[in-house]
Amino acid sequence: MIVETTIHSFSLWHHFAHKPGFDSISFAKLARSMDFQGISLSLNDANYRHLGGREIERMESLRAFLETHEMSLEIDTSGTTPAHMSEMLNVAHRLGAKTLRTYTRHDGTAEEMLEKTVGDLLVVTREACDLDVIIVLENHEDFTGSELLEIVERVDHPNLKILYDYGNSQMVLEDPLESLKAVLPQVYSVHFKDHVMIRADDAGQLTVAGVPIGEGFLPLTELTRCLLEQGLRRFTFENVWAYSAPIQDGRKALHGVNLGHGTFAYLDPPFDPARLVLKHSAHSPETLVELEMCALNRGHYA
């Protein structure tokens, strides 16, 4: 069995923010040195975030490096409005990326967000097909597995698939295994990561927090086995140390969720910053960069 492993730029977001000279080429070189076969790159802001700018020369330079070293590319954005998606599909095409990850940024109830997202994606899938780019819609702290599946089935286009994130269903209080079961036939790519739960008394509100892979409570082995049995052969490693997100308002615990136990077990304080950071301002940029690399290596070699 041959499995392609790639790494997400969010794994080193403090490097991009604080380490002088660290850019998309530096990231690709590091990924290659760690034996990853490709990268996922966040372009999730007006200046294309971890690409570092919108210049065509910058895009061509990264594409040339990746093609020279036979590395794959997936790019990330957010939002589903047709004008934005058209722009990003064309950026993906120029960069040589075969997939474009996005998630909804609509407001409202889950039903309202779902309807607006379906309407957007019905417009843009034709262009995705013309450019030979697969749109992967992520379970990004907003939809349950069944809600995400409904979107994809209603759009019903071969260029729209699902990106399954190992832990993001927790933000809507859905068990990761239940979420995966709902979307499994439509999963095209994944974000492999690890999480713990933090009590409201310790974080100000009930919170999901990222830790080095292997040091959290997600059922990594069981989730990975399900995906491999389904036939998935491409996994994106995402170190989410120092990331945290609250439980979404209005969500109630779904089937299989027992707060404080199992996958939703709480991590007790005091928190070792090598494992968990909730307040970035408590550490210098240099310390964040150092701790981030240590967390990446601990997860990579776990």
Label every model-predicted segment.
Residues 37-64, 108-109:
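Glycine-rich, proline-tolerant flexible connector loops at the mouths of alpha/beta enzymes
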Residues 1-18, 29-32, 145-160, 170-302:
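Histidine-acidic metal/acid-base catalytic patches
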Residues 1-21, 59-76:
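Mobile, glycine- and charge-enriched loop segments
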Residues 23-45, 95-99:
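Catalytic domains of carbohydrate-active enzymes, especially glycoside hydrolases
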Residues 20-25, 54-61, 114-122, 173-182, ...:
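Charged helix-capping and loop-helix junction motifs
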Residues 11-13, 43-47, 79-81, 104-108, ...:
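Active-site-proximal loop/turn and secondary-structure-junction residues that shape catalytic pockets
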Residues 40, 74, 100-101, 191, ...:
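Conserved beta-strand positions in the central sheet of alpha/beta enzyme cores
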Residues 29, 57-162, 300:
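Active-site acidic/histidine proton-transfer and metal-coordination neighborhood
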